[in-house]
């Protein structure tokens, strides 16, 4: 069996030109033009897929078999090209039978060429007639091949247009929620290319609307997600440099009384010592202390300053920004995190997903209560996983140590070794084991990993929260909620 691509190549048909015409026609459809006008950021993302579309269409041409009748006619044409006029005249009846059997569109024109009025019955086929016959036959085969190509491409166009409309509809709805910049729009478009989302995307829209009504929560996510720290790197084998410092030294020439000390200086003897010399019982004590240089005398000395030059190693510190790694977010799904806390935690994760898409990062969610459930929101099926995560209910106990252990194991993966760990909880839980605490501290000191805590309650246990580098508080109490709503309404 011969493929359509091979037939086009043998007939010297430029398939790239045909594919370009298909793409231009597809992009000019009113449906796509409307979406491009409404969502311009998605247009550039869609245009980046053009090479992929063409490759997909070429692959379809490679796998599409030519109909048997067309293949049989083309084989007969190839055999007719390699024979001379006499052999062609001999095989002409068989050629006409083949054209008739395959119901070739060229049959009528071939009969007209053979039975032309200017040709007498039994006249030999000339070289000119032979060439004209083959030329017209080739043109007929080319038209049939192009027609088959267009039928196939029309089917692909309808399939592709239907897929694009679904992707554009979904991406258009999610663009205000997840597409912060051109990079995010491109990644959102790539996420929509996964298998067609079977679940309702309404949870994404609902939590996106909830996040917009909670600007303080969104701002907190921005501060956490965009926070950067610097670390100092000492230069190895630093050279030495001259270091000048002023040094105060006592002068050798006495200038003024600077204190009292023990000595044998009779000229600067204190009056109390002279009193002992006038008492006969203490006279020997005076001479003993004189010999031992223990008499209290005034200290007279001056002060001078001089510049001292020493050498020390040059120590330069390079303040380098830590690269923005992926997010690993641990979400507490215990019963105490239900209700408004649950909605805030999910909306916060959605905000981190938005930041991850904009900054070309990855976002991994781990839910912990009595077990650990995992979602990667930026994978190929990230939208599907995000919908399942947002539809998850928060019920159960709190096993934070198991989640932190799973988080540390995840950070051992080379793809996640520079991740920022975020724990969202009310931190009303049991004390963490010393083994887990030591592992966290070891990563903080040796690998400079950062651990963030997002506290949804003011009643969290300090013994748990002290292991985190940063504690971001979002009070979900009724008073704080009313204050935020009042401030939000006042701003508008």
From Swiss-Prot:
Q: Subunit arrangement?
A: Homodimer. Interacts with RavA.
User: Superkingdom, according to UniProt?
Assistant: Bacteria
Give the family from UniProt. Answer: Belongs to the ViaA family.
Question: Where is it predominantly found?
Answer: cytoplasm
> GO cellular component terms?
cytosol
- Protein name in the entry: Regulatory protein ViaA
Q: Does the keyword Cytoplasm apply?
A: yes
Keyword terms = Chaperone, Cytoplasm
Compartmental location: Cytoplasm
Q: What does this protein do?
A: Component of the RavA-ViaA chaperone complex, which may act on the membrane to optimize the function of some of the respiratory chains. ViaA stimulates the ATPase activity of RavA.
Which PANTHER family has this protein been placed in? PROTEIN VIAA
Q: Which InterPro entries match?
A: Uncharacterised_CoxE, Uncharacterised_ViaA, VWF_A, vWFA_dom_sf
């Amino acid at each position: 069996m011969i493929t359509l691509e091979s037939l086009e190549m043998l007939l010297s048909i430029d398939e790239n030109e045909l594919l370009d015409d298909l793409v231009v026609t597809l992009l000019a459809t009113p449906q796509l033009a409307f979406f491009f006008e409404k969502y311009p950021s998605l247009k550039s993302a869609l245009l980046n897929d053009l090479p992929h579309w063409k490759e997909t269409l070429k692959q379809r041409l490679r796998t599409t078999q030519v109909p048997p009748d067309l293949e049989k006619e083309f084989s007969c044409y190839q055999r007719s090209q390699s024979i001379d006029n006499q052999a062609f005249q001999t095989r002409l009846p068989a050629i006409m039978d083949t054209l008739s059997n395959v119901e070739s569109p060229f049959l009528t024109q071939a009969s007209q060429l053979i039975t032309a009025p200017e040709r007498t019955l039994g006249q030999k086929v000339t070289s000119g007639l032979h060439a004209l016959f083959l030329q017209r036959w080739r043109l007929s085969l080319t038209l049939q091949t192009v027609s088959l190509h267009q039928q196939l491409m029309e089917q692909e166009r309808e399939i592709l247009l239907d897929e694009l409309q679904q992707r554009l509809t979904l991406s258009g709805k999610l663009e205000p929620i997840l597409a912060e910049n051109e990079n995010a729009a491109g990644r959102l478009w790539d996420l929509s290319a996964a298998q067609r989302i079977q679940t309702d995307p309404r949870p994404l829209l609902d939590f996106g609307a909830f996040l917009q009504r909670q600007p303080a929560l969104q701002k907190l996510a921005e501060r956490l997600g965009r926070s950067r720290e610097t670390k100092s790197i000492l230069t190895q084998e630093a050279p030495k440099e001259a270091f000048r410092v002023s040094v105060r030294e006592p002068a050798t020439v006495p200038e003024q009384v600077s204190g009292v000390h023990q000595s044998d200086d009779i000229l600067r003897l204190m009056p109390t010592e002279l009193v002992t010399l006038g008492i006969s019982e203490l006279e020997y004590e005076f001479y003993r202390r004189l010999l031992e240089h223990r008499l209290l005398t005034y200290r007279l000395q001056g002060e001078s300053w001089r510049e001292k030059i020493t050498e020390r190693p040059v120590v330069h510190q390079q303040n380098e920004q830590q690269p923005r790694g992926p997010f690993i977010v641990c979400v507490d799904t215990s019963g105490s995190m239900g209700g408004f806390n649950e909605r805030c935690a999910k909306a916060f994760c959605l905000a981190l997903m938005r930041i991850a898409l904009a900054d070309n990062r990855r976002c991994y969610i781990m839910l912990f209560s009595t077990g650990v459930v995992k979602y990667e929101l930026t994978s190929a099926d990230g939208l599907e996983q995000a919908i399942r995560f947002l539809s998850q209910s928060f019920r159960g106990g709190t096993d934070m140590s198991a989640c932190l252990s799973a988080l540390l194991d995840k950070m051992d993966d080379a793809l996640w070794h520079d991740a920022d760990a975020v724990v969202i909880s009310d931190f009303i839980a049991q004390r963490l084991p010393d083994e887990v605490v030591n592992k966290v501290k070891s990563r903080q000191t040796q690998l400079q990993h950062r651990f963030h805590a997002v506290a949804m309650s003011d009643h969290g246990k300090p013994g748990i929260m002290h292991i985190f580098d940063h504690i971001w508080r979002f009070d979900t109490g009724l008073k704080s909620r009313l204050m935020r709503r009042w401030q939000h309404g006042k701003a508008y």
